[in-house]
């Protein structure tokens, strides 16, 4: 299967808040999205973690 499940972690508090899928063959770089962190109570950058 080409799509793999990844986890997104907040860059400020380091908590893993979101899971999503991506095609690692088409996009090998790490994903970065601005999403809401309920522990920081604000929108922060969330990065893909292993």
Curated annotation (Swiss-Prot):
Keyword presence, Ribosomal protein: yes
GO molecular function, one term: structural constituent of ribosome
GO cellular component terms attached to this protein's record: cytoplasm; ribonucleoprotein complex; ribosome
An example Gene Ontology biological process: translation
Pfam families: Ribosomal_L33
The family this protein is said to belong to: Belongs to the bacterial ribosomal protein bL33 family.
PANTHER family: 50S RIBOSOMAL PROTEIN L33, CHLOROPLASTIC, LARGE RIBOSOMAL SUBUNIT PROTEIN BL33C
Protein name: Large ribosomal subunit protein bL33
């Amino acid at each position: 299967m080409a799509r793999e499940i990844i986890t997104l972690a907040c860059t400020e508090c380091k908590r893993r808040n979101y899971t999503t899928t991506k095609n690692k063959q088409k996009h090998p770089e790490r994903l970065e999205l601005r999403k809401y962190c309920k522990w920081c109570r604000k929108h922060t950058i969330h990065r893909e973690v292993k």
